[in-house]
């Protein structure tokens, strides 16, 4: 999942913002800023962080409940 979120959009230039500041930076080889568009930043954050967070919390909750059942037996 991380490879798809990171490499594919960057290679396909889906991350590029279209404002003037971003265009100047893209054309300047000395500019080191990574200017992204908002949709890419949100989608990347959700897929890379929030989806795994929810899955992990769900799995840990199930493990915790099962551990509580085992203690009661």
UniProtKB/Swiss-Prot annotation:
The keyword Cell membrane applies. It comes from Meriones unguiculatus. Disulfide bonds join 25-31. GO terms for biological process: adenylate cyclase-activating adrenergic receptor signaling pathway; norepinephrine-epinephrine-mediated vasodilation involved in regulation of systemic arterial blood pressure; positive regulation of MAPK cascade; regulation of circadian sleep/wake cycle, sleep. Belongs to the G-protein coupled receptor 1 family. Adrenergic receptor subfamily. ADRB1 sub-subfamily. This is Beta-1 adrenergic receptor. Cyanopindolol binds at residue 44. GO terms for cellular component: early endosome; plasma membrane. Keywords: Cell membrane, Disulfide bond, Endosome, G-protein coupled receptor, Membrane, Receptor, Transducer, Transmembrane, Transmembrane helix. Residues 13-38 are extracellular. Residues 65-73 are cytoplasmic. Beta-adrenergic receptors mediate the catecholamine-induced activation of adenylate cyclase through the action of G proteins. This receptor binds epinephrine and norepinephrine with approximately equal affinity. Mediates Ras activation through G(s)-alpha- and cAMP-mediated signaling. In dorsal pons neurons, involved in the regulation of sleep/wake behaviors. InterPro entries: GPCR_Rhodpsn (IPR000276), GPCR_Rhodpsn_7TM (IPR017452). Its main location: membrane. The chain crosses the membrane at residues 1-12, 39-64. One of its GO terms (molecular function) is beta1-adrenergic receptor activity. It is found in: Cell membrane; Early endosome. It is a multi-pass membrane protein. It holds the Pfam family 7tm_1. Interacts (via C-terminus PDZ motif) with RAPGEF2; the interaction is direct. Interacts with GOPC, MAGI3 and DLG4. Homologous desensitization of the receptor is mediated by its phosphorylation by beta-adrenergic receptor kinase. The gene is ADRB1.
